[in-house]
């Protein structure tokens, strides 16, 4: 059974579960720990080297019921609806981790968000803006740039039509950006994004769907004292901060369409056949 990032109401809990109760409204984190390694024994579930993705490595949430360890359940405030919660927790914790824990982004700094209309990109834009940063949204079409700006970016650039590095450096007065939030790894755009950085700037990345293998100008890297970090993780604090931002209305998901569970084939056809900027949600209560 597939289905990542479920959210719903707890039906029952096992013996020894203290923090979650039947009737609680929760969303589920996507990585399920093994519960038997040294990290899990110490309660550091997010460091589990054997974790699997819900709906990929074990049965997921495209069903009326799903059984998971209590460690992946996140309590939700009453004002956060299930579709919204499921979508924001998909990318919010990782974006928060990349921007602040790794990227060190501060209020007043400038961040370039690549793939700005995708799930991680739109999330990064909103979280950075909520922290007081200036955001440049970069995407591969005017329509997708517009989506990034709609969700809070201060400026947009179409990296297919425009020369990315030149436009960004002009916008920043020749200085460059403090942080590049990269989640594409396209061999055509990645080197240009890197050269948008100011001296002592940082590039963070968590994506490779654009190819994965890119060219690196090592002379630029060391002359400009650039830092490059990749990460797939997050912390419990990142999760809490994501829920808080969503509850306050500062982080919103772009939901393309909600399908009843009975129409899951149509949902998959939509996902496979269109270039989407929003999420597709399945609702088991709708039929």
Give the positions of each predicted feature.
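Glycine-rich cofactor phosphate-binding loops and adjacent beta1-alpha1 units
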Residues: 136, 146-227
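Mid-domain Rossmann-like dinucleotide-binding core that forms the NAD(H)/NADP(H) cofactor-binding site
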Residues: 81-162, 166
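NAD(P)H dinucleotide-binding glycine-rich loop of Rossmann-like/cofactor-binding domains
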Residues: 32-115, 150
């Amino acid at each position: 059974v597939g289905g990542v990032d479920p959210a719903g109401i707890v039906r029952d809990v096992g013996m020894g579960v203290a923090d979650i109760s039947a009737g609680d409204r929760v969303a589920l984190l996507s990585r399920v720990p093994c519960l038997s390694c040294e990290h899990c024994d110490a309660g550091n579930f997010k460091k589990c080297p054997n974790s699997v993705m819900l709906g990929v490595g074990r049965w997921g949430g495209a069903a009326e019921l799903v059984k998971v360890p209590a460690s992946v359940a996140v309590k939700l405030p009453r004002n956060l609806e299930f579709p919204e919660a499921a979508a924001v927790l998909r990318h919010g914790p990782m974006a928060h981790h990349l921007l602040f824990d790794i990227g060190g982004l501060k209020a007043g700094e400038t961040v370039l968000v690549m793939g700005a209309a995708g799930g991680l990109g739109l999330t990064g834009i909103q979280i950075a803006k909520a922290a007081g940063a200036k955001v440049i949204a970069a995407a591969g079409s005017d329509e997708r740039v517009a989506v990034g700006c709609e969700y809070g970016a201060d400026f947009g650039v179409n990296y297919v039509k425009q020369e990315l590095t030149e436009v960004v450096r002009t916008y920043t007065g020749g200085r460059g950006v403090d942080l590049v939030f990269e989640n594409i790894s396209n061999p055509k755009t990645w080197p240009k994004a890197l050269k948008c950085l100011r001296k002592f700037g940082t590039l963070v990345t968590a994506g490779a769907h654009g190819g994965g293998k890119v060219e690196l100008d090592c002379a630029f890297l060391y002359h400009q004292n650039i830092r490059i970090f990749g990460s797939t993780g997050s912390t419990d604090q990142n999760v809490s901060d994501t829920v808080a931002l969503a509850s306050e209305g500062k982080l919103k998901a772009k939901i393309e369409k909600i399908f009843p569970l009975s129409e899951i084939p149509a949902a998959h056809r939509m996902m496979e056949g269109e270039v989407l900027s929003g999420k597709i949600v399945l609702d088991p209560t709708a039929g």
